[in-house]
């Protein structure tokens, strides 16, 4: 480790005279030690291979939510998935303008440079970003209202799903909207020319998935029916109640 540090470039910056040095979180240091002693030791040859580059076959677009880690859910090895995470696992439509596009940049790199064969949009239950959109009493968290602007991308999904039903429970509406937003993100993916071309040639496949945090159930979007079905096993009774296309 010291040898690597000796070869690393020295980067200097001004912290500001009044900013005290913050200690690195001990939890992360402990986790890193555990990683070195266990996973890195077991997969050292894999990491040595990855030093020369990555060749993932799957891009996964997920939520920033700390409860939903794609690498853990899918038991992925290093280098298997190219993961992009944002609030509410949203994909904006293709928009070639001069503004900054983090998710679109990740998509471009995955499709054009890495040549991934699959793109998965992974949503999850009780998503805070979806709840914020559904709750019209929410106030901006800052003057910039970055989240508020970002989650306007959910609008078309809400319109397509018919909005909240008159007698629909709020939590059920949020879950239904979570499913509908996955479908909307898939539709937005198909507005990107590179995705259109490669999917049309059969070299790229798009998938929608939904993870229930409390139960660990994974649901997959069935393109034929437009409904979400269990990846393994039987459909839970609660999920059967939640449809993404019909208000209660």
Put a short name on every predicted segment:
Residues 8-12, 16-56, 89-117, 128-248:
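Divalent-metal-activated hydrolytic enzyme cores
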Residues 61-63, 85, 122-124, 207-212:
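Short beta-strand segments
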